[in-house]
Design a protein with these regions (language model features):
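Intracellular juxtamembrane helix-capping segments at the cytosolic ends
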Residues: 115-128
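Loop-to-transmembrane helix entry/capping segments in MFS-fold secondary transporters
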Residues: 42-43, 130-139
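Extracytoplasmic gate region of multi-pass secondary transporters
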Residues: 5-63, 151, 155
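Hydrophobic core of transmembrane alpha-helices in multi-pass small-molecule transporters
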Residues: 18, 100-115
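Cytoplasmic membrane-interface "Motif A"-like loop-to-helix N-cap segments
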Residues: 69-80
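Helix-to-loop junctions at the C-terminal end of transmembrane segments
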Residues: 60-71, 159
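C-terminal ends and interior cores of transmembrane alpha-helices
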Residues: 82-95
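A membrane-interface helix-boundary motif in multi-pass transporters
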Residues: 157-174
Length: 193
């Protein structure tokens, strides 16, 4: 663990995972309240949250399979793109609250964004394989949880201060891009190759 923590790759993974989970939970925790605030019924908002999990299952399986063919970085980038699209759809829904945009948000978040989980362990294993993998991945998970906690908290604080979720969703979308770049910089493909 001590050797891993002294590498750039470890810290790029940490940045990628923290930023990715920030976006994930910023959206997941606030989307239902947000959808109700902008005019969707409580039933539709709850349906959207449940549907995200439903479409996540084939997305995770498909993206996990795809990662074995095209590489982990590509699949991580696809997952991050899912959260970018999700955040943009959420922002657009405030002005155009249509079922189509709701379906785009649900599909992008679930089928693409939730695919991040299909490669988290594999990315870390490709860079830090061996007997210390568990302690390295566990440490990264502790850092990741920080991003998962900060996302909902900061998004809620921004909403409370401004009365809008827009800035919070822009931040989440931006951090999704940061996450994708960080995983490319960690470069598991160079270890795998």
């Amino acid at each position: 663990l001590a050797r891993a923590v002294r590498t750039r790759r470890f810290w790029w993974l940490a940045v990628g995972y923290i930023a990715g989970l920030y976006a994930w939970y910023a959206v997941q925790v606030h989307q239902t309240k947000y959808l109700v605030e902008i005019g969707f019924s409580a039933t539709d908002a709850a349906w959207a949250l449940g549907a995200v999990s439903l479409v996540a299952v084939p997305g995770q399986i498909g993206l996990g399979y795809l990662s074995d063919r095209i590489g982990r970085e590509w699949v991580w980038a696809i997952g991050c793109l899912g959260f970018v699209i999700c955040c943009l759809a959420l922002i657009a829904l405030e002005r155009t609250p249509t079922p189509f945009l709701l379906y785009v948000m649900v599909t992008a978040q679930g089928a693409l964004g939730y695919g991040l989980t299909s490669v988290m362990g594999a990315i870390t294993a490709e860079i830090f394989q061996g007997r210390h993998y568990g302690s390295i991945f566990g440490t990264l998970m502790l850092l990741m949880i920080g991003g998962g906690a900060a996302g909902p908290w900061l998004t809620g604080a921004i909403h409370d201060a401004t009365g809008s979720y827009a800035i919070g969703f822009w931040i989440a979308g931006g951090l999704s891009l940061v996450s994708a770049v960080a995983i490319w910089l960690a470069a598991p493909r160079k270890v795998r190759a």
